[in-house]
Amino acid sequence: MALLDLAQEGMALFGFVLFVVLWLMHFMSIIYTRLHLNKKATDKQPYSKLPGVSLLKPLKGVDPNLINNLETFFELDYPKYEVLLCVQDHDDPAIDVCKKLLGKYPNVDARLFIGGKKVGINPKINNLMPAYEVAKYDLIWICDSGIRVIPDTLTDMVNQMTEKVGLVHGLPYVADRQGFAATLEQVYFGTSHPRSYISANVTGFKCVTGMSCLMRKDVLDQAGGLIAFAQYIAEDYFMAKAIADRGWRFSMSTQVAMQNSGSYSISQFQSRMIRWTKLRINMLPATIICEPISECFVASLIIGWAAHHVFRWDIMVFFMCHCLAWFIFDYIQLRGVQGGTLCFSKLDYAVAWFIRESMTIYIFLSALWDPTISWRTGRYRLRCGGTAEEILDV
């Protein structure tokens, strides 16, 4: 009986610690968003003396927004940069889009690379290798095909690349688009994701996504170049780790990495979340414990039980009040990341928020159930530590 009492006391203490940690994350991310995001960065050096940048753009297939997204990179207001467009397959329709833009912007230093170079199991690395090998500038900007930018995006990122910084990354967010699936994505990338992403970076944990990353090429070369990361599916995590292990700091751009894919749906979003969770579980096994208890409904139940055990408060009343507070703070976070008026109503937000939170346990259990992922054109079996092997159809 004494052992049971001790276990309950321990669980109650855990609940209160969880409460403090999660609400610190809320406050840190909201304050950081208000102070840092969507602010014009201070110019660290004269415009004419900004260093050259090689943009590596991996492309696969075409969606309705691809040409408009790509065109924003040809219209950057930056003195010295090159655009290296990378397409793996010779019959990919993205090639025609690239050729159209190359013809429209002859004064932009841009080239098209077709065919890639097989150096490992990561298709993105394979696609980028020929461009990486001929990149002529000291700064490498790897940016996904679904990202769109504004003219001063690159200037902002380079201004963050100060003397001791080795990597500049953008907080992933989603552009305003039509439909409930777009709202669902926007709610996730404006609430749950930045809360974890920002608080991790503020407290010194290296949390980086590869959607938009500016890196020092010489530091990557010291780590073995891109080829050293071809054995991983989550190459962005291991590239960031290699840079951090060499003593370099990270900085976050004041502009978000604006995702603007023209192809989106609830099922695509769900599949993406499951894939990301699988990768996190294999790279960081502690995710198995930390991730479920950091979500609203599970956390509210644990903390509610702790409050009931210690103060005899009604669990369900506490659960509802805690979820309501979480819901409100998430809305504040979302408005901060958006940096302006949302394109959907508060009712749309409420529905999308509830559905997203309700999906979390299913997503987590689905990720645990099957260790394989489908990405781009292949299927892969994940191994502990982040490596993977390709599953070949016989």
From Swiss-Prot:
Species assigned in the record = Mus musculus (Mouse)
Record-linked SUPFAM superfamilies: Nucleotide-diphospho-sugar transferases
Q: What is its EC number?
A: 2.4.1.80
Q: How does it assemble?
A: Interacts with RTN1; regulates the ceramide glucosyltransferase activity of UGCG.
Q: Which Gene3D superfamilies match?
A: Spore Coat Polysaccharide Biosynthesis Protein SpsA, Chain A (3.90.550.10)
The alphabetized UniProt keywords are: Acetylation, Glycosyltransferase, Golgi apparatus, Lipid biosynthesis, Lipid metabolism, Membrane, Sphingolipid metabolism, Transferase, Transmembrane, Transmembrane helix
Per the Swiss-Prot or TrEMBL annotation, the motif D1 is positioned at 92
Please tell me which stretches of this chain the record labels as motif D2: 144
What happens when the protein's gene is inactivated?
Answer: Embryonic lethal. Homozygous knockout embryos initiate gastrulation with clear differentiation into embryonic germ layers, mesoderm, endoderm and ectoderm as well as the regional expression of critical genes. However, a major apoptotic process leads to their resorption that starts at 7.5 dpc and is completed at 9.5 dpc. Neural cell-specific conditional knockout does not affect early brain development but mice die between postnatal days 11 and 24. Dysfunction of cerebellum and peripheral nerves associated with some structural defects are observed.
Q: How does it sit in the membrane?
A: Multi-pass membrane protein
For this protein, the parts annotated as crossing the membrane are 11-32, 196-215, 288-304, 310-328, 349-369
Family designation: Belongs to the glycosyltransferase 2 family.
Query: Domain of life here?
Result: Eukaryota
The record's section on InterPro entries has: Ceramide_glucosylTrfase, Nucleotide-diphossugar_trans
Protein name (record): Ceramide glucosyltransferase
Functional description taken from the UniProt entry: Participates in the initial step of the glucosylceramide-based glycosphingolipid/GSL synthetic pathway at the cytosolic surface of the Golgi. Catalyzes the transfer of glucose from UDP-glucose to ceramide to produce glucosylceramide/GlcCer (such as beta-D-glucosyl-(1<->1')-N-acylsphing-4-enine). Glucosylceramide is the core component of glycosphingolipids/GSLs, amphipathic molecules consisting of a ceramide lipid moiety embedded in the outer leaflet of the membrane, linked to one of hundreds of different externally oriented oligosaccharide structures.
| Top EC class for this record | transferase
The record, for PANTHER family, names:
CERAMIDE GLUCOSYLTRANSFERASE
For this protein, the record's Pfam families field holds: Glyco_transf_21 (PF13506)
User: What reaction(s) does this enzyme catalyze?
Assistant: an N-acylsphing-4-enine + UDP-alpha-D-glucose = a beta-D-glucosyl-(1<->1')-N-acylsphing-4-enine + UDP + H(+); UDP-alpha-D-xylose + an N-acylsphing-4-enine = a beta-D-xylosyl-(1<->1')-N-acylsphing-4-enine + UDP + H(+); N-(9Z-octadecenoyl)-sphing-4-enine + UDP-alpha-D-xylose = beta-D-xylosyl-(1<->1')-N-(9Z-octadecenoyl)-sphing-4-enine + UDP + H(+)
Q: Which residues form the active site?
A: 236 (proton acceptor)
Q: In which pathway does it act?
A: Lipid metabolism; sphingolipid metabolism
Side of membrane Lumenal, spans? 1-10, 216-287, 329-348
Motif D3 covers 236
Domain comment?
The D1, D2, D3, (Q/R)XXRW motif is a critical part of the GCS active site, involved in catalysis and UDP-sugar binding.
* One GO cellular component term noted in the UniProt record for this chain: Golgi membrane
